[in-house]
């Protein structure tokens, strides 16, 4: 017994976690934010000021007669193009935000790639530091898009920066979380205030469980759905409101799910929740099967 205990102690000492000293501190957070925020405003600000000073100011603001604003062509064009210029500047701003964030994101991925596993918090860790930097870095770009006039550009932002992979035809409503390490297939709908968290802190000072969340094609999360790290939902799945999945849950798909933790819902409960008959539900299923068969035939041709 003593020999085995000594061997186990030696194995534990040999397999202990290697401590990694790092130099990255809060100045990287501030630097990334200021570069992304102010760097993305330079070109749009120049375009807007040039338009205002050279065209809008002399053609519209300096017009002495109020009647001339509606009777002459120049004041009319100046006022007409002003909203378009503002929209153009906003789109350029969003593109540059994504471009700078993508550049920073790729640097951090080269230093410490994102991967599934447990990130310790009780020792200095390069993985932990870059995880926090990436989490902070994506916050402003995400909110600048999803709370702006064109929230559907969030798909472009995620794919362009490389934080998430979003398929074609997928709609993402305003949500919390879900800004990194998420893979969503085609023609899916992510409902309002759905929370996809690819990380979970195990207690106040515990380790961080970090794992990719994967959703297949034609997946619907109605609203207020929470998915934990490592959740995998296969094709043709529909989640009822307030349904949630615990860590590393896997759903086979082709069904409706409800509750916490997620579980299948049968046709009687579906008709009860939706207020429809089973015949109407069967008709909807047949229409869906026909449309999916047509799409498969088109792709085959």
Labelled PLM ranges:
Residues 1-156, 160, 268-301:
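Terminal amphipathic alpha-helical/low-complexity segments used for targeting or macromolecular assembly
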Residues 98, 113-118, 167, 216, ...:
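Glycine-centered flexibility motif
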Residues 2-3, 191-301:
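Glycine-rich hexapeptide-repeat left-handed beta-helix
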